[in-house]
Amino acid sequence: MTQARPRVALFVTCLVDLYRPTVGFAAIKLLEEAGCLVEVPPSQTCCGQPAYNSGDRANAKALARSVVDAFQGYDYVVAPSGSCAGMIAHHYPALFDDDPHYRGKSEALAARTHELVSFLTDVVGMEKVAARLDGSVTYHDSCSGLRELGVKAQPRKLLNSVEGLSVIELAEPEICCGFGGTFCVKYPDISVRMVTDKCRDIQATGAGTLLAGDMGCLLNMAGRLKREGSSIKVRHVAEVLAGMTQDAAPIGEAKKG
């Protein structure tokens, strides 16, 4: 860390902002418990990944430039999403091959951008959390977090410190859920088959709750589980680690009361 209390900017992500703000609050709570000074830059916008994956490099570049400008001056940038963090860390610099100034700025941003749980364990050295959840969970490894950022052991390490919780592994935790951002729109039949297979694996564990670190995956799997009449609850891993499962109903369910 660069100082006793690193200054961390939270990249909220579009899906957290629009569908699950509790995840953002959970991320702030965890980061503050880890000793960070947390700020949420108000001018932040989409990371540009949907445009990038669709081949729209012009709009992806424009969005990336906005993000680069909004997140200057922080020690670290942290996102509760391996997908968005991976976009910034691995794809931004190449967007500015024709712009040396922004190429340098984007490389600097990429070097200090992290997925939330891996930042907590690998950068600030968090060993355990002060949370409790009675029951069993299973964990889905989101593609970008796993393959671009190496996020696998980190969430399991912290989940194993949650009192009352047991973690049951999927038979194939690394298999894609079929979301893939715009993939599920471009190839809906393939996406449905993939998420159906994934949900079969989830239900076979007997776990009461499904966790993951990316809202896109969670929304996709929650929707399929609900259509199949499953009672499995679906949550972002940050909500469990922060002890905030009472603050919002499971994904896809209405809050009672």
Regions found by a protein language model. Name each.
Residues 1-257:
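Iron-sulfur cluster-binding electron-transfer modules in prokaryotic oxidoreductases
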